[in-house]
């Protein structure tokens, strides 16, 4: 055997590891190495859950306003429905008597305000649902629709009754209608109070509509 060839290493005997090492020395990527693992960032903060805090406050305000609207609507209906006056000077055959059901408009006033108050009472469970679930859209939208109908009903009844009350107080020279409130003072005062309370119910309903609109607004 030639001693000069002892230091020679055959090319076929070169291991793949040595070739990879030589490639690394030249700045090239290693063939068999796996890519470094991606860094994962773990957040320790808990994701905030949607609680709808301000909407819950609006729902509580809605419930309070609804109670006020119920009291005003039912109060207006009761005031008008119990309003009557008999003048003290009368005989057995002649009486001067004024009663709410003598006027068809006042009958309509009593019925419409009572209906509005009844619908408002029926809407209380939905208002409670909106307090428990302030993010629910369905109950809130249904409340908005019913409040719009009730507002239109109450305003129509109060406006029609206000026209009759005005004629009762001032009369009409063109139609030769005399003012009766100079004689039936208590009756006219009762009708005026009922009309004012009915308009208060309408104001409550307007506030309820604004509250429902704000509650339906997305944040």
Swiss-Prot record:
GO terms for cellular component: plasma membrane. Coiled coil: none annotated. It is a multi-pass membrane protein. The chain crosses the membrane at residues 58-78, 109-129, 148-168, 194-214. It holds the Pfam family CASP_dom. The keyword Glycoprotein applies. Residues 79-108, 169-193 are extracellular. It is found in: Cell membrane. Keywords: Cell membrane, Cell wall biogenesis/degradation, Glycoprotein, Membrane, Transmembrane, Transmembrane helix. Residues 1-57, 130-147, 215-219 are cytoplasmic. Disulfide bonds: none annotated. Residues 1-43 are annotated as: Disordered. Glycans are attached at residue 170. GO terms for biological process: cell wall organization. Regulates membrane-cell wall junctions and localized cell wall deposition. Required for establishment of the Casparian strip membrane domain (CSD) and the subsequent formation of Casparian strips, a cell wall modification of the root endodermis that determines an apoplastic barrier between the intraorganismal apoplasm and the extraorganismal apoplasm and prevents lateral diffusion. Homodimer and heterodimers. Belongs to the Casparian strip membrane proteins (CASP) family. This is Casparian strip membrane protein 3.
